[in-house]
Regions:
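Charged, alpha-helical interface segments at or near domain boundaries
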Residues: 45-96, 101
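Short Lys/Arg-enriched helix C-cap and helix-to-coil transition segments
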Residues: 24-44
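A short, conserved structural fragment
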Residues: 21-25, 164-165
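Short, charged surface segments at domain edges that flank catalytic/cofactor-binding sites
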Residues: 77-118, 133-146
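The −1 position to Zn-ligating cysteines in a subset of zinc-ribbon hairpins
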Residues: 8, 115, 128, 151
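A detector for short metal-coordination/catalytic motifs
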Residues: 99, 103, 121-124, 132-194
Length: 194
């Protein structure tokens, strides 16, 4: 990022430390920013700290600008099925949703080392950035990477359909419907190991 914006890595790190001084979660752990540096960051913090969807898209918009392109050009393949007839606010909203979902996926997969949390499968085309709290149930957590888990397509579908879930200690729990299949070859192969 430092190279992209023409700064040194140290100056970027210092700016991030200023944001740390505004973060209540970091403050509760005793992390402090630089004296006086936080005021330069406060307006951005206030604008985006409770709106991760806007933050992600604005970051991508700014990054595209530094790369001398637009968000729509940068994500052309992802957006190719949006009809040209869709314009204005409707198009902008759909573009933002698609771009944010892509960024969310990139962050979640990176957080898990591009491996399924349950099986270790490391083929990106088979990996899904699943939402722990479903996307439709909590707008505040939609784009929060802490609300994401990297699963292979099989385990994502099982999680989405309520066949598996996770305890507070991160242990896999099987639904009674899935447990009816204990003893079957596929259960032994795909579910016993997790």
């Amino acid at each position: 990022m430092a190279n992209l914006i023409g700064r040194t890595p140290s100056s970027v790190a210092m700016r991030l430390v200023n944001y740390a001084s505004l973060d209540p979660m970091l403050q509760s752990r005793g992390v402090q920013g630089l004296a006086g540096g936080a005021e330069k960051c406060r307006s951005y913090w206030d604008e985006f700290s409770n709106n991760q969807e806007a933050l992600l898209f604005e970051c991508e918009r700014i990054r595209a600008s530094y790369e001398q392109t637009s968000v729509e050009n940068k994500y052309r393949d992802l957006l190719k099925d949006i009809p040209d007839s869709l314009v204005g606010e409707s198009r902008a909203s759909l573009v933002q949703i698609r771009v944010n979902q892509s960024v969310f996926r990139q962050i979640v997969l990176a957080n898990y080392g591009y491996k399924c949390a349950l099986s270790g499968i490391d083929i990106p085309d088979l990996l899904v950035a699943s939402h722990v709290i479903p996307w439709s149930e909590n707008a505040q957590e939609r784009m929060n990477p802490k609300n994401g888990i990297c699963l292979s397509s099989l385990y994502d579908k099982a999680f989405d359909k309520g066949l598996i879930s996770f305890s507070d200690q991160y242990h896999v729990m099987f639904s009674s419907r899935l447990k009816e299949n204990v003893g079957k070859d596929y259960f032994a192969q795909y579910f016993d190991p997790i």
